[in-house]
Regions:
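Conserved glycine(s) of the Walker
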Residues: 51-54
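Structural recognition of the conserved hydrophobic beta-strand(s) that form the central parallel beta-sheet
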Residues: 97-99, 117, 133-146
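Conserved Walker
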Residues: 85-86, 120-136
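Charged, amphipathic alpha-helical linker segments immediately N-terminal to NTP-binding catalytic cores
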Residues: 1-24
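Conserved ATPase-coupling elements of RecA-like P-loop NTPase cores
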Residues: 22-25, 104-112, 126
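Pre-Walker A (Motif I) flank of P-loop NTPase domains
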Residues: 40-44
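AAA+/P-loop NTPase substrate/partner-engagement loops
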Residues: 56, 60-108
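Pre-Walker A adenine-sensing motif
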Residues: 18-37
Length: 146
């Protein structure tokens, strides 16, 4: 049977990190990036220096997450396409991660409000319908610090 520390090392190795290079605090920090995969509607923002693997886990580690890059999205793409009557990314993925969070914008003027409502309650309104989804939202971005 594995000890707690051995389990932590296994989890970190499964994401491509070598635990021997990290102290205990850093290991726990790296593990917190994975909370969104096991906890519904967990929302978090991680800021850090470039090239530290902030978005790697959401793009490469799990088939149940999607990384939205490029900064711009639509309410139809993210939440609900009313013309197709189809739920968007929050209904299809366990984790929706936004890369370069500083550049996020919506083409729709009500996009930010719908996102805030979803993050607070796990549901959103489109037309006459109230729709629930369990996706977690992660926001990752760079800071200008070495």
């Amino acid at each position: 049977a594995f000890t707690e520390n051995e389990w932590i090392d296994v989890l970190l190795r499964s994401t491509g990190m070598e635990p021997a290079h990290f102290n205990e605090r850093t290991k726990w920090h790296l593990l917190t990036r994975m909370i969104a995969f096991v906890e519904n509607n967990y929302n978090c923002c991680e800021l850090g220096p470039r090239g530290t693997g902030k978005s790697h886990i959401y793009k490469e580690v799990s088939p149940n997450s999607i990384l939205v890059s490029g900064g711009q999205t639509t309410v139809a793409n993210l939440f609900y396409n009313m013309s197709r009557r189809q739920v968007g990314l929050v209904g299809m993925w366990d984790v929706v991660a936004f890369d370069e969070v500083a550049g996020i914008s919506f083409k729709d003027k009500d996009g930010v409000q719908i996102m805030k409502d979803f993050m607070a309650s796990g549901s959103f309104a489109r037309g006459r319908d109230s729709i629930s989804a369990s996706a977690s939202m992660m926001f990752v971005g760079n800071i200008n610090q070495p």
